């Protein structure tokens, strides 16, 4: 009887592993890098290797997520503005266009969740989750539906800070529960002008939300997935700054940690919200999401000015692990670089190379274990308008999506080499693709694409 239970458990574990490989449940799982798969194409266009393309009503920059035959995306209806490709703020330079978009006095927006069929692109269902006016203004290239949803395979969990909304929806489109997410009490915080962007994280039966878009207050909270019950919340004042970095659940041999890059530092908590360690020394604006590769944690912040630090951290730390003046490493900081971080895109580690994409169209590679430069900043295309989406990689190729809708394909290796570009003809902003089941699901400004080999 006992041996039968062991066999059953092993079968269940193997099925779980297969299932996980077939799904893309949240923002940048696997840190944007997937195993080699001959089914995945490296060339496509507006018609070549396009399995389907469908319109997505509304505006939103959340990334698509996939579970089985379901493709989920969010958007907001009523926001008729359409962002245009163009350089974002970087290197401390002011933009040439207005940066803030105020909410009209009579605004009435609808926050939507869409479920598309993975095989055909057909809309399975759509669900309105909330209606009303956004609580804050936004940056002119942001949206009021920028956060990526998450799923545990049974429900989709949607968080949109401009609506004060946290909701759980099952795979048939039924709203299971909703919860109003309170903003900091009036007087404790100024209203940030940029809008939010940090997506939720999920671990077992817990959802983690972070809010760092207010200039002088920050909070981190956990909720139960079953009913949306609040489990704990930390709220603190901070030195003026803004952040949009998604929290990261770091599982390693010693323990499970919740990592945030905010408040001008890297913070680690256990899943019950107890502080484990912190590292001071980030810049005032944090956007890239922390991630782990080959046993190391990568955290960075790249705006404003010349101070753009990257920190590579070993597991097992406790307390304050901040570098002393003049140090670039210590017991738990494997290496650091004060001028390597990007502003919007999150970097990737691929084939032992830390690859960094800068919004102004520059690309670098460093040894992921030591920080040694493999090659310095290389210009991708002088004609490109800017890069906001995070890179991804597979099959010895690195993919860089410009806001013009061009995806540049690089050969991974010690030399900078562009092989070709795939033009999609529609703006790509901060949405990263889902790479699953031998296909890519890419979100452009108005459409959702399934890229897959259609010819052999």
Where are the predicted features?
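Bacterial N-terminal signal peptides
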Residues: 4-16
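Noncatalytic, solvent-exposed loop/strand surfaces
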Residues: 18-456
């Amino acid at each position: 009887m006992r041996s039968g239970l062991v066999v059953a458990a092993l079968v269940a574990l193997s099925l779980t592993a297969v299932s996980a490989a077939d799904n893309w449940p949240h923002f940048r799982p696997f840190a944007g890098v997937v195993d080699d798969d001959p089914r995945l194409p490296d060339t496509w266009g507006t018609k070549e290797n396009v399995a389907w393309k469908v319109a997505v009503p509304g505006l939103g920059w959340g990334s698509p997520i996939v579970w089985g035959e379901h493709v989920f995306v969010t958007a907001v209806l009523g926001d008729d503005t359409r962002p245009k490709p163009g350089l974002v703020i970087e290197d401390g330079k002011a933009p040439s266009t207005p940066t803030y978009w105020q909410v009209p006095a009579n605004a009435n927006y609808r926050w939507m969740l869409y479920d598309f069929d993975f095989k055909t692109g057909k809309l399975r269902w759509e669900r309105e989750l909330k209606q009303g006016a956004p609580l804050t203004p936004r940056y002119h290239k942001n949206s009021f539906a920028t956060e990526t949803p998450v799923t545990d395979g049974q429900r989709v969990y949607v968080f949109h800070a401009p609506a004060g909304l946290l909701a759980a929806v099952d795979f048939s489109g039924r709203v299971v529960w909703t919860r109003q997410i309170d903003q900091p009490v009036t007087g404790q915080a100024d209203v940030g002008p940029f809008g939010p962007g940090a997506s939720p994280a999920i671990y077992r039966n817990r959802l983690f939300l972070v809010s760092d878009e207010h200039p002088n207050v920050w909070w981190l909270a956990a909720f139960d997935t079953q009913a949306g019950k609040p489990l704990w919340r930390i709220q603190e004042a901070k030195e003026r700054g803004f952040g949009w970095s998604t929290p990261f659940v770091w599982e390693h041999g010693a323990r499970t940690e919740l990592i945030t890059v905010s408040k001008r530092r890297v913070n680690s908590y256990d899943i019950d919200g107890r502080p484990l360690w912190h590292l001071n020394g980030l810049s005032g604006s944090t956007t890239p999401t922390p991630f782990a590769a080959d046993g190391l944690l990568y955290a960075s912040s790249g705006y404003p000015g010349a101070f753009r630090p990257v920190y590579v951290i070993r597991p097992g730390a406790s307390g304050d692990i901040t570098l002393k003046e003049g140090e670039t490493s210590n017991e738990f900081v494997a290496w650091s670089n004060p001028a390597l971080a990007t502003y919007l895109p999150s970097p990737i580690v691929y084939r032992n190379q830390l690859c960094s994409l800068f919004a102004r169209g520059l690309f670098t590679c460093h040894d992921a274990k030591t920080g040694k430069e493999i090659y310095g900043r290389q210009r991708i295309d002088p004609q490109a308008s800017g890069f906001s989406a995070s890179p991804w990689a597979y099959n010895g190729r690195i993919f860089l999506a410009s806001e013009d809708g061009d995806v540049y394909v690089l050969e991974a290796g010690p030399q900078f080499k562009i092989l070709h570009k795939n033009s999609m003809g529609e703006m790509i902003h901060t949405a990263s693709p889902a790479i699953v089941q031998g296909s890519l699901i890419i979100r452009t400004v108005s459409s959702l694409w399934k890229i897959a080999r259609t010819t052999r």
